Amino acid sequence: MTILQSPCAHDAELYLLFAKGKRPDRLAIKAFADRLPYLAVTHDPAHDDAASDEPAGDGGGAGQHNWLELLRDGLTFDLVGIAPGPAATFPQVSHRFDLPVLPDAQDYEALTLRPGPHIASAGSSMPLTRSLLALASDFVRQFDDLAAVVWRPAESAIGRRFFESATSAWLDGGPFPALGLTAFVQTADGALESVGLSFWIGQELRIEPPLCADRVAATRLGIRLVNHLVLAGGLSQDDRIAAADGTRLALRPSRNRALISVWRE
């Protein structure tokens, strides 16, 4: 296996969903940063009226001052949508984890958290993305009204406890949180395909039928394979691995390298 670079630089962002009327204001964010020795607010546009400093989109705009720049691990991140200004544009959500229903704009308001413009070109680099997710976990631990995190590359909404536990375990050396940072969908022909894996490795995963006849078992296999592929950085040529039951599985990238197919030999 060789490392393949992901092309999805613009997707390196997430959304923090708060109960209606519970978004934090700039004072709450500054107090939050003051409690963590590794976190700082490095720019507040309320103290600088230069319109050019305002981030575009996501509810940000000249004169609104509804954002702050945060510094963590030597990297800057923009937090957009703080109260009392307008919330960030509510994200597209297609998958849910540890949530009873898909969240929507009727019940929640969003803040966007993303790499600052000076480092956004780093895209899906692992150090940058890990710091972004670690910062989101900090928010979950500090704000009780934060109900869920939406990971944009997978269009997945993740309940606060599941997000924090799975992400923290990965950051501490555990398995990649495939349920949440990726998702799985069943195709019309009965295969199981990943959603959002291309952010991490530039490729999606397809588990071919009949290997995915048992959806639960296929999802477990998908979780294992996603962890394997993220660790490896992608797949550039045919490979074989052993399944949990000892049978051999074949992995093959498509001609354009965009899809990795898996089947039992």
Question: Residue spans of the language-model regions?
Answer:
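Conserved aromatic-histidine-acidic binding/catalytic patches
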Residues: L17, A120-L128, P210-A217
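Aromatic/basic-lined ligand-recognition segments
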Residues: Q92, W151-E265
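Short, extreme N-terminal segment that most often corresponds to the first beta-strand
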Residues: M1-H47, N256-E265
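Structural alpha-beta junctions
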Residues: R35-H43, L133-A148, V230-Q237
